[in-house]
Amino acid sequence: MKDVVIVGALRTPIGCFRGALAGHSAVELGSLVVKALIERTSVPAYAVDEVILGQVLTAGAGQNPARQSAIKGGLPNSVSAITINDVCGSGLKALHLATQAIQCGEADIVIAGGQENMSRAPHVLTDSRTGAQLGNSQLVDSLVHDGLWDAFNDYHIGVPAENLAREYGISRQLQDAYALSSQQKARAAIDAGRFKDEIVPVMTQSNGQTLVIDTDEQPRTDASAEGLARLNPSFDSLGSVTAGNASSINDGAAAVMMMSEAKARALNLPVLARIRAFASVGVDPALMGIAPVYATRRCLERVGWQLADVDLIEANEAFAAQALSVGKMLEWDERRVNVNGGAIALGHPIGASGCRILVSLVHEMVKRNARKGLATLCIGGGQGVALTIERDE
């Protein structure tokens, strides 16, 4: 099979819920990244074979949002596109599918990633087609129902985080300390300009003025142990998971340009990283946050690595309790994990996050001259994904 490489990796800044990017649809955000990948790699738009983008919240977004992003991003009508929904893992699963297409010879060049605008997710009147006859009708929040609700146990996906906290003995104090560390690392990374190379600025209008959004909006400058300790539990009055030690609701997009190594050589493009292996797993939905343990183990087994061989890890921080449980099970070196902060600080635009962590991983590996990297996420509904990449020595 063909070797698959990444030659471009970009993302938008991550916007707060109803924040600076709220006025831009997921398609607008995704198209900006698609366009920037073409411009920065100088790959002819017509040479792209397919676009694969994750998006979870598609109610009211129009037909096939990935196709919209491809065309709006400057690709010709001849380039096909598909939108996928693997919940939080969508953006990384897109890379799995792109890798398979290239390995099998069905494509040479694929743009893969994810996009989401959680701020614009509509409320849905589910009985409007048939009529309510008598009585009231209920509006369903598609953001929660389609993105954050466990369909099997009929509860918020924060409840499995509480389950993990109890199962693995993760205290409130440990969760808050983890969250504070994520905030501090993200703020230090922003101040040091660690994300500049990976971010595509977004132009937006505010009070008649054009603003350039080029920095992640979510990380807090006022995060403190005292402030985190004052927050009430969000899902269980006697629980430990709060808004402060969980990821947030956000807007953003991320994508990578992938191709066969032979095509990269033919186009004289520098290789940022090689795809080495990927894995998807399923677990009990009530313990969905532990799935990265099994996805990581399967992925490492496929490539023949030990966890100690991996130089940098990006593991999505859905919840501090979840991240700590995974770390406890895998016994990884915390100094190699989310070195610039994670989703608790940076945010979690669900359809985009899988690719966002991969983009950040690639760029940090380049900066540190690291060789081996791992990206992994848990997925609402009881799944996990992982992907390993390697850079040439």
Feature roles, as predicted:
Residues 1-61, 65-73, 80, 160-172, ...:
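Conserved active-site "lid/cap" helical segment
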Residues 10-12, 22-32, 40, 174-266, ...:
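N-terminal extracellular/periplasmic Venus flytrap/periplasmic-binding protein-like
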Residues 160-162, 198, 206, 276-345:
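Active-site pocket-lining segment
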Residues 109-163, 167:
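Flexible glycine-/small-residue-enriched beta->alpha junction loops
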Residues 24, 55-110, 152-156, 222-248, ...:
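Conserved catalytic cysteine-centered active-site region
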